[in-house]
Amino acid sequence: MQGLLLFAHGARDPAWAGPFQAIAAELQIRRPELPIALAYLELMAPDLTTAAGALVAVGCTHVQIVPMFLGASGHVRRDVPPLVESLRAAHPRVLFVLHDAIGEQPSVIRAMAGATLDLITSVTLPADPLNPATPTELPQS
């Protein structure tokens, strides 16, 4: 059975995880048959080992790990591969596939560029920056 493990950095503020939880929830709606876990490198729980163990416990024999990072930072290049190797050693009958950072995917780059343009073209700016009482709409492209 296939499983999906989303792996994010983690933060002290619990609200930081909101977008990642929303992604996991959206994926579960789109693929209700797919066991999905969300794990964090640091500062939040569950960690990668715990989340992978939960997927294995429900019968997953193939687990795809998607680093939810914008780029291949030091964490993705330096910290994640040894963690995945430890999963492989702990669960030798499970195939763990580590993908590239999600932010390096062309579809994510296009989506973020589009969202950025949506943000900057929907803002009303003052016609005269020294007199903010005179707003003007930016042209839509």
Language-model regions, residue ranges each:
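Active-site-proximal alpha-helix that buttresses catalytic centers in soluble enzyme cores
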Residues: 1-141
